[in-house]
Amino acid sequence: MKQKVVSIGDINVANDLPFVLFGGMNVLESRDLAMRICEHYVTVTQKLGIPYVFKASFDKANRSSIHSYRGPGLEEGMKIFEEIKKTFGVKTITDVHEASQAQPVSEVVDVIQLPAFLARQTDLVEAMAKTGAVINVKKPQFVSPGQMGNIVDKFKEGGNDQVILCDRGSNFGYDNLVVDMLGINVMKNATGGHPVIFDVTHALQTRDPFGAASGGRRAQVAELARAGMAVGLAGLFIEAHPEPNSAKCDGPSALPLDKLEPFLVQMKAIDDLVKSFPELDTSN
């Protein structure tokens, strides 16, 4: 099957091309921290020759607690993204939660992301499709890989086929996630070869059944990411923080920022190796 290429400016994203890194921080905590984190990602990815897109959220609208930090909001968030793009010359990605946010965000950010909890909301999908922007769809934890074809079809009906899919794990009983590596190729096949990336950060989440914040398995980030890269991915999605234990959102799953380079050295080595192999058809 021919793999679809989705272009983010001069960055080509496809299942059979070198992987693209979608990385940054979970939520915009401050302008200065965002600049610091982006600068480190840019330095490391340029050194290693990895195509890079900066990620952060301007509003975490789905926090468990009403008291949890959500972010700077749309207006201030777009100012930070504009400065990051101007300063570092990077492409950017962020999520939207309401149909009214799609157009103004797409005027600043290069890729707009459809959150997992909202991936079947048709009005939001249609609003995002109308922007013409590249779309990243998070696979809901409660949706099977094969069902992702229906979500992609909604975007195509809305006139936009520039869609990337992102696996972030599936529900495994209550308050736990598991990643079905076989589902990666199921998503590729169900969508006619659309690029599939893997969000290793959020796949590491755990929950206290009665708690108001997510836990995580940061110590296992490398082993889970290595497994994903071995399947063959269009990209890897990861969040990092200089002080994960002090992060305002999802710190327990965040990669320590100073571990980014050795982490990516491993990921690139696996990606290069896997994509050097000829295709092996074992179906017959």
From Swiss-Prot:
Reaction equations catalysed: D-arabinose 5-phosphate + phosphoenolpyruvate + H2O = 3-deoxy-alpha-D-manno-2-octulosonate-8-phosphate + phosphate
GO CC terms, sorted: cytoplasm
InterPro entries: Aldolase_TIM, DAHP1/KDSA, KDO8P_synthase
One GO-annotated biological process of the protein: keto-3-deoxy-D-manno-octulosonic acid biosynthetic process
Subcellular location: Cytoplasm
Domain of life: Bacteria
Chain segments annotated as coiled-coil in the UniProt record: none
Pathway named in the protein's UniProt entry: Carbohydrate biosynthesis; 3-deoxy-D-manno-octulosonate biosynthesis; 3-deoxy-D-manno-octulosonate from D-ribulose 5-phosphate: step 2/3; Bacterial outer membrane biogenesis; lipopolysaccharide biosynthesis
Pfam families for the chain: DAHP_synth_1
Alphabetic keyword roster: Cytoplasm, Lipopolysaccharide biosynthesis, Transferase
Catalytic EC class: transferase
SUPFAM superfamilies membership: Aldolase
Recorded family membership: Belongs to the KdsA family.
UniProt-recorded name of the protein: 2-dehydro-3-deoxyphosphooctonate aldolase
Organism: Serratia proteamaculans (strain 568)
Lineage: Bacteria, Pseudomonadati, Pseudomonadota, Gammaproteobacteria, Enterobacterales
